[in-house]
Amino acid sequence: MLKVNEYFAGKVKSIGFDSSSIGLTSVGVMEEGEYTFTTALPEEMTVITGALKVLLPGSPDWQVFMPGEKFFVPAHSEFNLQVADATAYLCRYLSK
């Protein structure tokens, strides 16, 4: 079953699904902008196209992730993103 999600007045959209090979996952696109997300489960984010500038929980420095690169966000935390150009991503929701 597909679940369509929309955030930040439509500037971030994703389609969630449960994959037998990789588990609970969403794939989406972020338009240019700055965003703050919170997590319920641990997340593995992979950039597909574009780039994400990320401030991870507990980190004093922003990091840039390019296509094929991934980062991890702990459960029950908040992280910030800066997007300079439309960027596609894959998000895997990891077990607790």
UniProtKB/Swiss-Prot annotation:
Organism domain of life: Bacteria
Coiled coil, from the record: none
GO cellular component terms, A-Z: cytosol
Catalytic reaction(s) noted: a purine D-ribonucleoside + phosphate = a purine nucleobase + alpha-D-ribose 1-phosphate; adenosine + phosphate = alpha-D-ribose 1-phosphate + adenine; cytidine + phosphate = cytosine + alpha-D-ribose 1-phosphate; guanosine + phosphate = alpha-D-ribose 1-phosphate + guanine
UniProt GO MF annotations: guanosine phosphorylase activity; purine-nucleoside phosphorylase activity; thymidine phosphorylase activity; uridine phosphorylase activity
InterPro entries named among the record's database cross-references: Ppnp (IPR009664), RmlC-like_jellyroll (IPR014710), RmlC_Cupin_sf (IPR011051)
EC numbers, comma separated: 2.4.2.1, 2.4.2.2
SUPFAM superfamilies for the chain: RmlC-like cupins (SSF51182)
Major enzyme class: transferase
Pfam families reported in the protein's UniProt record: Ppnp
Keywords: Glycosyltransferase, Transferase
PANTHER family registered for this protein in UniProt: PYRIMIDINE/PURINE NUCLEOSIDE PHOSPHORYLASE, PYRIMIDINE_PURINE NUCLEOSIDE PHOSPHORYLASE
HAMAP family per the UniProt record, alphabetical: Nucleos_phosphorylase_PpnP
NCBIfam families attached to this UniProt entry: PRK10579.1 (NF007875)
Annotated function: Catalyzes the phosphorolysis of diverse nucleosides, yielding D-ribose 1-phosphate and the respective free bases. Can use uridine, adenosine, guanosine, cytidine, thymidine, inosine and xanthosine as substrates. Also catalyzes the reverse reactions.
Protein family (similarity comment): Belongs to the nucleoside phosphorylase PpnP family.
Protein name per its UniProtKB record: Pyrimidine/purine nucleoside phosphorylase
